[in-house]
Amino acid sequence: FFYKKNLEEKYLKNWKDLQPKTVQLLNYFNQNVGQYPYKQYSVIQGGDGGMEYAMATLITGKRKFGSLFGVTAHEMAHTWFQFLLATNESLHPWMDEGFTSYISNKAENEILKEGKVNPHEGSYRGYRTIVERGYEESLATHSDRYDTNWAYGTASYSKGNLFLSQL
C-alpha cells in the first residue's frame, strides 16, 4: 500500500481499513475466479478515479470507505477480466468492464456483508432506464464508436454484468 500519510484523518483511516479488506478481496477472487499469478499486488494513491494495471491499482485518496473499497475491488478484478483472460477492452468493453463489475459486486456484497439478495440490482436499473429512453446500443459496438458515453457505460458495465448474472 502506498498513500499519502498527510491525508485528513478520516481518509487516512479509510486507507488503513482497506488493507485487510484487500487481502479478503484477493482471497475471494482466487477462490471464485482463479489464482492470482504474481507475487504482489499494490494499491497506490494516485491518478484520477481508479485505474487498473496487472499488478496494481491507482486510486484517488479522498474517498469514503465504501467508495474506496468498491473502486479497489473493481480495479483489482481487472487482473482476471482483462489481463489474464486477455479480453480486448476496446473491441469488447462489455467483457472487460461487465465481467469485472459482476465479480466485484459479488465480492463487495460478501466481504462487506451487505446482505443484498441481488448485488447487480443497480445494473438492472441502469439497463432498464437506457432501454426505456431509447438509447441502448449493441454490445458489438467498438468502445470508441458509441454515440454517447451513457450508452458506452451502460453497455460495458451494466449489460456485460447482466450477461453473466443471467447464466
Language-model segments: which ranges?
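Acidic/His/Gly-enriched intrinsically disordered linker/tail segments
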Residues: 91, 97-165
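Generic hydrophobic alpha-helical segments
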Residues: 68, 164-167
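Juxtacatalytic substrate-recognition/specificity segment
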Residues: 1-93, 103, 107, 146-150
